[in-house]
Amino acid sequence: MHKKLKISVKFFKLLLLILLLNNNANSQYLVSCNFLNSSSSSLLSGATGLVLDFDVDMYKMTYNTINTQGIPTIATGAFCIPANTTCKNFPFAIYNHGTSLRKDNVPSYNNIEALIGKVFSAGGYFVCMPDYIGMGDSPGLHPYVHAETEATAAIDMVRAAREYLANNTSFMDNGETFITGYSQGGHACMATHKYIQDQNLTNEFNVIASAPCSGPYDLSGIMADTIISPTPYSNPGYIVYLLASYQLAYGNIFSSWSDVLYPPFDTIVSPFFSGNNTSLDMSLLNSLIPNDMSLLIRDTCMNNFMNDSVNMNHPWWVALLENDNYDWLPTAPIRMYYCTGDEQIAYTNALNAEAAMNNNGALDVQAVNVGNGNHGNCVLPALSAAFNWFQTLKTPCDFTNSKDVSKLNTQISPNPFKEKIMIESSEIIDIEIFSPVGKSIYFNSNIKDFRIETSSWPKGVYIVKTQSGKNLHSSILIKN
């Protein structure tokens, strides 16, 4: 019992044997999580042709996050858990959905795109599908293609999901995180991955890989070219959505729609961006406004924008540059799946990102062509490729170690924690606590009830091993 507990490097690389504590933790992110429906693996496999091992339960989650001004707000999303299995240790996957104007056309309302998250979950993942702020039951207008809040909506949902698992289930978060998304969700995927790395959150979110699909990563290049180009654009509603979003986020894009759009389009678009739209969709908006940007956007606005293409000090340029996410140096692998026939989001977004990242010194970044389909037809091959790639990288569930790991009558609280953790045990135990990178930061033996000061510990996910005799208990603690 006095000998220091042993733990292998593989344990930390794979984070097996992690049992989320079943105690009454204080939820800092989770507001509610309510069951919606169940789906069988056979149904999901038949719809996709993928090999899927697990049935899936889907929940509607409401959680705390922040808006574009950093002010607390709520967001919603769909949360999927593998069901009817003795396996308990799964990685997290984040699926970011595509463009939607209707607040109710989102995963938490069980829309068609929610099927994608169910499929990933059936492959063995806890899946978070954020609706994004301003969508679902979140108040106000959605800040479309706003990188920071796309990221925080996803990150805070995973935090809320961890709280739910810890307090309501016996499932284990195995410490791995995978991120994907399609269309706008591709941008959100890239934004989330970049934010985790930029904000030094890798201890809390161990990103194994990300797979952005058909996304607009190069806003200041390719999207700007779309605005300026005389070539008609198939989805002019995207441009209007972008203007509305960045006006919400930055407040300096326009004063009123009539300042930036010609009549009658200035009055036509307004109801689509009221902040409570549940009936007007993108296809309707595209049908009501011209595909030629010179007929939609006033000459004065367009000329001011075009004439500043070198210095890029115009508010539109500043906003686009702020939300670019193609030119950075990822430390985890990325695959950007695309189709060459995409009429909505130019596949050169992926090529530009691949070139920029590799030029920056990235070790494992590729843009992958999955066919010549259009934007709609690219969904299945792109996301199937992402799924199959993730399956080669994730840690398989350890069915043996998922059983009989909670024989010790020991409680550790609170979880999540901040300044201290309390250990209460009915028997003498040894305890060792490890940082997310595998470093032992605390060890004590032959103890029972005691307190550990944790104020100096950084935020992240900590692994706790307790042992009494031959009984070993592995668990996870989260510091927020």
Language-model segment annotations:
Residues 1, 26, 405-480:
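C-terminal outer-membrane/trafficking sorting elements
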Residues 27-86:
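Catalytic-loop region of hydrolases
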Residues 69-72, 83-119:
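Short, surface-exposed "cap/lid" segments of acyl-processing enzymes
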Residues 144-167:
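Alpha/beta-hydrolase active-site loop
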Residues 160-232:
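Primarily recognizes the serine-hydrolase "nucleophile elbow" in alpha/beta-hydrolase
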Residues 213-327:
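Accessory cap/linker subdomain of secreted extracellular hydrolases
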Residues 224, 317-319, 323, 344, ...:
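C-terminal catalytic histidine-bearing segment of alpha/beta-hydrolase fold enzymes
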Residues 336-342:
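Short beta-strand/loop motif that positions the catalytic acidic residue
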